[in-house]
Amino acid sequence: MAHALTQAGVAVAVLEYTLLPEATLAEVVREVRSAVAWLYRHAGAYGIDRDRIHVGGSSAGGHLAAMLLGDAWQSRFNVPQDVIKGILGLSGLYDIRPLCDIGVNEWLRLHDEQAALLSPALDLPLQGPPVVLCAGGLETTGFKHQTLYFHALREEHGLPVRLVENTHNNHFNLVNELANPQSALFQATMDMIG
């Protein structure tokens, strides 16, 4: 994936974050926001244009990328409101409140109020960068529903969003489409980056 993107002229930085349940989801979101702020401040040293930061993620990474769309975090990390120029979300969860009611919450440790605060679908900005969304055609119903729901919600609020159709990938191999410059997902990503 990184090779195809760098061949197309995109500088790629990979963020690391503490995995759950070692950290809470709120702590992980803070880590990702902090990493973006660090990248913004140090981009020049790595040949990265800090005014063209786009963030993408798959599964939990799709959720974390979407958590960068809200309006409330940038001032706390001393970055411009529009630090993020685009988001790529692959099979992400955008409203995590349903997770409070299933077994996975034993290690997520979420309560309803936290889940609402950590749901990008419930924190839509008045303006925002373009978002490209995709869920694999062989994905489970829940991830497909979350992707379609977030797409519809952004459209309804007049926020720039593009849904990329995919019929042949599942939750685990969808990201491989970014290694193929001929794929619709790669092309949509490059269109967003500009």
Can you annotate each of these PLM segments?
Residues 1-194:
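Alpha/beta-hydrolase superfamily serine-hydrolase fold, recognizing
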